[in-house]
């Protein structure tokens, strides 16, 4: 079977495993080459038949011919993806389905640990008629059924252990390693490690003891059944807990954690704390019945027939003699007088079990009330470390109290501590933010910053917290593989970049390159993004918010231009001109505008070096369509275009007005000459020729002086208008660079 991989941009084929004829001599010069993706086995000379069998054929021949051992280390070692082609179902330990089953098995182990203490509730003290100790048959049937169901799940898990591959220890040099899929090796490994523990844990010993009692003579089997259940459950707890620890650790290695959420993790550890309380309460109930039985036995020692008195302490004992029956009727009164836990002058000290005897829990037939009371007793004493327990001098009782105190300490140190860690993880970011704010306030107070600067710092911290919740998104993304990082950036930024008109019609490769290099930026109100004359080190693409863009054309007096930037606009276009210029040096261009945030602004920033790289790698930026789009949406080009149009309009208006004035002047001159001719005809002939010529010359001089004065005024006004509109054209990006 061949597997293809891409190495250094080329497609290579590698052989996973080959079946080599066992008849070939070792001296045939077999050469084995190990690659980083598999094994490549080649034979030289003396071959009797070819060793080009596929991996699937090798799996079929496993029963008869065996396997080739490579270096006596890894037998039938493959990679996880090769498990899918095997005919026999072998599970990958990190398979999702197997992880779900492992979680179910962990839950079944928890249920098994919680079901076993229910056997302690089977003994019951009957004080209704004759005082005796019996077995609750209904609860016995229910408990054995639950235990059998849990054991079925446990047996299923044991069966899966024979079909779950494991990682070969010799292949853990680099990466995850190779999986051993040989069923014989898997079975050998499981049988030598955990099979004995699993077998002891799943033995149906409690079911056998209860079944024997239910189908036996009952009366004579109460004491052996009670003793057997106590010993069996305690003994089987050891392998169950021993097997549960590696199961949870294995689940953490493959899945990371049993509960991923904070509340789920807290509930998981709280469940274990409640389970410990349940076990403690069940032990307390069983030991209470034992102490009651001990008191009755002490009372029977003073009777004429102690042996017969002990026999009647267990319900179901049959007697034939009428004399014995009459004597038995007096025994309950005797037991109550000697073993009453309510009397102040009781002859027997029950110690910590007196509460169970006096409350009637041991004689109650209602399981739910009995279970809740014992659960509360266990939870109360584990939480208080057994401080309220008043023990007697009985050694078993004292040891049980010591065990409660130690268990309480361990639970607080482990379970409650882990639960607190999970709950604190919900507010750890908030606590970090509070610490940073406190440090910031102390620093500002130490440096005596003015109130307006302090308010700006507080506003920025608050805005950044609301937007990111204390998560450093950039570090999270940068820690991922390149391919995954590119896909995440594409998902987050592609639609936003396409909303920028400059990149609306770009191809996918260019958009991916831009998205991969964008960095999120946040700005609060009244923050200056860039000032006029400062170097432009990044190009900003506005995602949300409004900004003000102002220019004075280098501080020219009387010149002021203001524009608004909104969602979809960009600033720092001087950087694009610099990036598209192949002859541009390392000096960054100066900003021609001052950009100030009017509201809270979210934007993506493209740094100078990143933009230079994108412009040099993608020729799509060097197109006329991009040139027109850049000019249309550039604030610098808009300002120049508006000034250019205004200047052209003024020139046109000036020429139009000059033409109108020339027409008016001609009309005035013609009208003046006509009026002068009419007045000359009406005058008397006495006027001499000399007087007429002198007046005409004066009129001509006056009209010329007025025309020259108007012309000078127009020239001065035109020169002043030229100085107002003389705005330098923005530099043209080199879109034709190749």
From Swiss-Prot:
One of the record's GO molecular function terms: calmodulin binding
SUPFAM superfamilies according to UniProt: cAMP-binding domain-like (SSF51206), Voltage-gated potassium channels (SSF81324)
Pfam families attached to this UniProt entry: cNMP_binding, Ion_trans
InterPro entries named among the record's database cross-references: cNMP-bd_dom, cNMP-bd_dom_sf, Ion_trans_dom, K_chnl_volt-dep_EAG/ELK/ERG, RmlC-like_jellyroll
Binding-site residues for a nucleoside 3',5'-cyclic phosphate, renumbered to this chain: 502-632
Ion transport among keywords: yes
Topological domain ranges for the Extracellular compartment: 126-139, 215-227, 290-395
SMART domains with a match to the protein in the record: cNMP (SM00100)
Topology of the protein relative to the lipid bilayer: Multi-pass membrane protein
Region listing for Calmodulin-binding, in residue ranges: 618-633
A single Gene Ontology CC term: plasma membrane
The IQ domain, residue ranges: 638-667
Transmembrane spans: 105-125, 140-160, 194-214, 228-248, 269-289, 396-416
Keyword field contains Transport: yes
Function: Putative cyclic nucleotide-gated ion channel.
UniProt subunit comment: Homotetramer or heterotetramer.
Family the UniProt entry places it in: Belongs to the cyclic nucleotide-gated cation channel (TC 1.A.1.5) family.
PANTHER family, A to Z: CYCLIC NUCLEOTIDE-GATED ION CHANNEL 15-RELATED-RELATED, CYCLIC NUCLEOTIDE-GATED ION CHANNEL 7-RELATED
Protein name: Putative cyclic nucleotide-gated ion channel 7
Source organism (scientific name): Arabidopsis thaliana
């Amino acid at each position: 079977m061949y597997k293809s991989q891409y190495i250094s941009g080329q497609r290579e084929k590698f052989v996973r495993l080959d079946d080599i004829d066992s008849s070939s001599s070792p001296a045939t010069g077999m050469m084995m080459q190990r690659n980083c993706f598999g094994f490549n086995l080649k034979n030289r000379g003396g071959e009797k038949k070819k060793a080009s069998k596929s991996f699937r054929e090798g799996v079929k021949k496993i029963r008869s011919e065996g396997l080739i051992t490579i270096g006596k280390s890894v037998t039938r070692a493959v990679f996880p993806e090769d498990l899918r082609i095997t005919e026999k179902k072998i599970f990958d330990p990190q398979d999702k389905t197997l992880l779900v089953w492992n979680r179910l098995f962990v839950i079944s182990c928890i249920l098994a640990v919680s079901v076993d203490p229910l056997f302690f509730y089977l003994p019951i003290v009957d004080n209704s008629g004759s005082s005796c100790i019996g077995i609750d048959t209904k609860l016995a049937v229910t408990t054995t059924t639950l235990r059998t169901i849990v054991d079925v799940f446990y047996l299923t898990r044991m069966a899966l252990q024979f079909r779950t591959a494991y990682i070969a220890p010799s292949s853990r040099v680099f990466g995850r390693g190779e999986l051993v899929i040989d069923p014989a090796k898997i079975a050998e490994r499981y049988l030598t490690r955990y099979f004995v523990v699993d077998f002891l844990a799943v033995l149906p010993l409690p079911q056998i003891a209860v079944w024997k009692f239910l189908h036996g003579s009952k009366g004579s089997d109460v004491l052996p059944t009670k003793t057997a259940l106590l010993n069996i459950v305690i003994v089987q707890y050891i392998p169950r807990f021993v097997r549960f620890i590696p199961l949870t650790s294995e689940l953490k290695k493959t899945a990371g954690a049993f509960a991923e959420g904070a509340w789920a993790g807290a509930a998981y550890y709280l469940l274990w704390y409640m389970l410990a309380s349940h076990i403690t309460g069940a032990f307390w109930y069983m030991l209470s019945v034992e102490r009651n039985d001990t008191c009755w036995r002490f009372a029977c020692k003073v009777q004429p027939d102690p042996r017969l008195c002990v026999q009647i302490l267990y319900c179901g004992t049959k007697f034939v003699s009428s004399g014995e029956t009459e004597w038995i009727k007096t025994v309950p009164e005797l037991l109550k007088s000697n073993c009453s836990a309510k009397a102040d002058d009781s002859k027997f000290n029950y110690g910590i079990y007196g509460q169970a005897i006096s409350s009637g829990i041991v004689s109650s037939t209602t399981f739910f009330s009995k279970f809740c009371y014992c659960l509360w007793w266990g939870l109360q004493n584990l939480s208080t470390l057994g401080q309220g327990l008043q023990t007697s001098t009985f050694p078993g009782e004292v040891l049980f109290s010591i065990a409660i105190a130690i268990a309480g300490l361990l639970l607080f140190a482990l379970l409650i501590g882990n639960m607190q860690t999970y709950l604190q993880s919900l507010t750890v970011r908030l606590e970090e933010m509070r610490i940073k704010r406190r440090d910031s306030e102390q620093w500002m107070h130490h440096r005596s910053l003015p109130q307006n600067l302090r308010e700006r710092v507080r506003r920025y911290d608050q805005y950044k917290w609301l937007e990111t919740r204390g998560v450093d998104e950039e570090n999270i993304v940068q820690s991922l593989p390149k391919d995954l990082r590119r896909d995440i950036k594409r998902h987050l930024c592609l639609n936003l970049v396409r909303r920028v008109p400059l990149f609306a019609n770009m191809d996918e490769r260019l958009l991916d390159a831009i998205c991969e290099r964008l960095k999120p930026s946040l700005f609060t109100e009244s923050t200056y993004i860039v000032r006029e004359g400062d170097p432009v080190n990044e190009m900003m693409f506005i995602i949300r918010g409004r900004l003000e863009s102002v220019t004075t054309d280098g501080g020219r007096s009387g010149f002021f231009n203001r524009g608004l930037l909104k969602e979809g606009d960009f600033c720092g276009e001087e950087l694009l001109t610099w990036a598209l210029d192949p002859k541009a040096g390392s000096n960054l261009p100066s900003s021609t505008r001052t950009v100030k945030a009017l509201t809270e602004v979210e934007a993506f920033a493209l740094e100078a070096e990143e933009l230079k790289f994108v412009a040099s790698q993608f020729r799509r930026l060097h197109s006329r369509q991009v040139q027109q789009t850049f000019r249309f949406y550039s604030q610098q080009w808009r300002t120049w275009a508006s000034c250019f149009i205004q200047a052209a309009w003024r020139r046109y208006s000036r020429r139009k007005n000059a033409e109108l004035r020339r027409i008016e002047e001609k009309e005035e001159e013609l009208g003046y000459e006509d009026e002068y001719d009419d007045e000359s005809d009406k005058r008397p002939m006495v006027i001499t020729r000399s007087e007429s010529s002198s007046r005409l010359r004066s009129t001509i001089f006056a009209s010329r002086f007025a025309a020259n004065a108007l012309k000078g005024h127009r020239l001065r006004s035109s020169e002043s208008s030229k100085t107002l509109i003389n705005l330098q054209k923005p530099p043209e990006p080199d879109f034709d660079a190749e």
